[in-house]
Amino acid sequence: MKNIIRLAIAYIRYYKKQAAALLMGVVLSAALFTGIGSLFQSGRMAALENARLEYGDWHYNTRGDFSSEEEFIKKLQGKGYEVEKYGLETVRKAIEEPYNIQFVYADKGYLDMMGRKLKKGKYPEKENEIAMDSYTLKNLGVEEKTGEQVALDGEIFTLSGILTEMPEKLPKQQGDFMQVFVNSTLDYGKNGTFLYLKFAEDGNVYKQVTAFANNFGIKVRNFTRNNGLSSYVGAEAPADILETIKTGLKYKEAGFPYIWEQLNGNGTLTDKVILAALALFSAFVIYSLFQISVSKRMSQYSVMPVSYTHLRAHETG
């Protein structure tokens, strides 16, 4: 082993230019691959953070039909999953006039996930108090000022607070509606509670929601995923990918463009293809440099027997 190492060092010293060229090719290829990979990773993280703002910082939601919130909190971390953040939204009532509006009570976790922060005033503390964002106030023709009276569905509420807008693209997933926030004690007997979950993103999110569902005896199909974030955090079911490919191959009018569009969520597949192409290119460059070096050595070695023959002939002549 030592002899091999010595031979390699001697070779590098003797053929400095070729060794330097090969080393430079390896370094430049590695630098190119690493640089592009880092660039893609930075872009991906920036896109993920932007998606959190546009869709909300959650992975799945489901009906929050738990016996008690205290019991649920005890199981935030279990075998195969870790709930990093959760929020509860209770829809007290929904009306269609003058607009599609939901009367909602939400806990701090939900408000945080949706980026709902108080700009003015306070969250409703009484049954006749209400809070909403500037967009909803504008549509209802109410002045953006706490203490204003708001008439909705035959009731009069006092505007206690003004919040920031809901995530811009949330209605694309849940329907076109506006929210007004009410006190926890206001009850119309039509409550629907929804649990929003964000799992630890250092692990596969789909596997975590599966483990979570099994732990609480909930069917995975009863969970609705946040499509805006799913491709970034691994929240898509493997069956979805296979089904997409089958559909694309089954229907000629769909074909490869359909498969690519469905699987290339947020451009992640494009990034992987480009990185794979760069890896192949880097390997080709290194291989080419190595082949050139080997070819030169082979040509030199082939001259040696001829030179030796001429030398012997000269000596005997």
What is the meaning of each model-derived region?
Residues I4, T309:
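Charged catalytic carboxylate motif
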